[in-house]
Every structure is written in structure tokens, then in C-alpha cells.
Swiss-Prot record:
Family: Belongs to the bacterial ribosomal protein bL35 family.
Example of a GO biological process term: translation
Keywords carried by this UniProt record: Ribonucleoprotein, Ribosomal protein
Origin species: Rhodopseudomonas palustris (strain BisB18)
GO MF, one example: structural constituent of ribosome
InterPro entries in UniProt: Ribosomal_bL35, Ribosomal_bL35-like, Ribosomal_bL35_CS, Ribosomal_bL35_sf
Superkingdom field: Bacteria
Official protein name in the record: Large ribosomal subunit protein bL35
Upper classification of the organism: Bacteria, Pseudomonadati, Pseudomonadota, Alphaproteobacteria, Hyphomicrobiales
Any one GO cellular component localisation term in the record: cytosolic large ribosomal subunit
Length: 66
């Protein structure tokens, strides 16, 4: 059976850490931030660690070679 290909959209959005956790950027920073407080905008910086089950699904179906 041939090797599964990595989904190119997932490759751009998710990274797998050395310990196997999946991280991604926070959503909600493209537009409409005039409504948000400075604190809300600040908290959307950086990356977040996905929940364990979500991370397992991402690795299984979208990043099989990670």
C-alpha cells in the first residue's frame, strides 16, 4: 500500500511538537477586531495546544507522516 500523503492545508496550519502535541495559531484575528478589547486581542497572539483528541485526529488523518 502506498504511503499516505500529508494534506497540504493542514501542513500550513498545524505543527507537531517534539512530544507529539499539535499546535496551531489562534483564530479570530483577520478582521472585526474593533469590537474586541485590547486584552482579547493580546490573548490571541502566539499558538495554542490542541486538545488531545483533536490532535490525535489531525495527526491520523491529515499529518500521517508527522
Amino acid at each position: 500500500m502506498p504511503k499516505l500523503k500529508t494534506k497540504s492545508g493542514a501542513k500550513k496550519r498545524f505543527k507537531v511538537t517534539g512530544t507529539g502535541k499539535v499546535v496551531s495559531a489562534h483564530a479570530g484575528k483577520r478582521h472585526g477586531m474593533i469590537k474586541r478589547t485590547k486584552k482579547q486581542i493580546r490573548q490571541l497572539r502566539g499558538t495554542r495546544i490542541l486538545f488531545k483528541t483533536d490532535g490525535e485526529n489531525i495527526k491520523k488523518y491529515f499529518l500521517p507522516n508527522a
